[in-house]
């Protein structure tokens, strides 16, 4: 742990490339294959996404109830809002689905509702990307949307996904 902290703070690039090599499936057989018939996400990512589509307040693997966690998230964004307002900076907020959310949730996600409600009378703009992705899913399939817009086995957008989001943001602004 000490070595990792030392590397992280004193040699960030070395630390990053050590991580990349460690996670590269040519060197680590624990990493899922780059392309399978269905993506395999890290357990932590699956757990992190679960609250958005799970109706239970207590989810196995979470330390606190979801209701408490939501309050914490809102408090943190509220602090950001106050800081921005104090500096005369307008706040806009965008929400988009993670792959797990896209697979297991609906366009009217509690995730969307929570941030939309927060943005009332606070945000310059609230940008909801859920309808775009759920529409794409409806027109093709969940897996096709993942292949087209996300890195496989990852919750992040690929180049095409980022271009897609950028074009939608350009339309809004």
Name what the model sees in each region.
Residues 61, 141-152:
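Short glycine/proline- and charge-enriched loop/turn segments
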Residues 100, 131, 148-149, 155:
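Flexible, active-site-adjacent loop/turn segments at secondary-structure boundaries
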Residues 116-120, 152-154:
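Glycine-rich loops and low-complexity Gly/Arg-rich segments
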Residues 149-173:
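Histidine-centered active-site loop/cap adjacent to the catalytic His
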Residues 1-117, 124, 129-140:
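Serine-dependent acyl-ester chemistry module
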């Amino acid at each position: 742990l000490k070595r990792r902290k030392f590397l992280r703070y004193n040699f960030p690039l070395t630390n990053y490339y050590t991580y990349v090599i460690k996670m590269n499936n040519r060197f680590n057989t624990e990493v899922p294959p780059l392309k399978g018939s269905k993506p395999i996400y890290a357990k932590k990512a699956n757990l992190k996404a679960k609250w958005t589509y799970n109706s239970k307040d207590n989810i196995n693997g979470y330390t606190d109830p979801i209701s408490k966690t939501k309050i914490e998230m809102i408090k943190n964004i509220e602090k950001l809002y106050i800081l921005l307002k104090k500096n005369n900076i307008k706040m806009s907020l965008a929400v988009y689905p993670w792959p797990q959310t896209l697979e297991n949730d609906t366009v009217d996600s509690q995730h969307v509702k929570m941030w939309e409600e927060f943005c009332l009378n606070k945000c310059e703009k609230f940008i909801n990307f859920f309808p775009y992705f759920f529409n794409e899913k409806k027109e093709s399939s969940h897996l096709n949307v993942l292949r087209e817009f996300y890195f496989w086995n990852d919750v992040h957008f690929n180049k095409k996904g980022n271009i897609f989001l950028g074009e939608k943001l350009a339309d809004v602004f």
